[in-house]
Regions:
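Active-site pocket scaffolds in enzymes
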Residues: 1-124
């Protein structure tokens, strides 16, 4: 269900409190391992810019810049806490310790391939 990113960012939830915002891995609904499928969409309500994420990975980490406070950027810009959001397609955290998670193990000679597409647009 769509909602604003900030809606629950200060929720009374242990994981949100520990991370001081979102730093969560979401399990993506896949029909089969390695399937390229939709993962997430964000939209800026002011500019109407959108970003959609498609990936072959089983998980999507969302991080809301919870520790950016005062980080300096280009041209003298300063980034305050929570002034960014990241969508990182990846395997599940702690995968090697959970045999029922999709494997992330690579043996010598193995090739690892994944695809992530970030699609930008404008939507009224």
């Amino acid at each position: 269900t769509p909602k604003t990113i900030g809606q629950d960012i200060d929720a009374d939830n242990e994981q949100i409190k520990n991370g001081q915002g979102y730093d969560h891995n979401y399990v993506l609904n896949k029909k089969e391992e390695g399937e390229l499928s939709f993962a997430a969409k964000i939209k800026d309500p002011v500019s109407c810019r959108t970003m959609e994420v498609y990936t072959t990975e089983p998980g999507l980490q969302m991080y809301t810049g919870n520790f950016l406070a005062g980080i300096s950027g280009q041209h003298g810009a300063t980034f305050p806490r929570r002034s960014a959001v990241c969508f990182e397609a990846q395997k599940f955290p702690d995968t090697p310790n959970h045999p029922y998670f999709p494997s992330c193990r690579l043996k010598p000679g193995d090739t690892y391939t994944q695809k992530t597409i970030y699609k930008f647009g404008v939507e009224k």
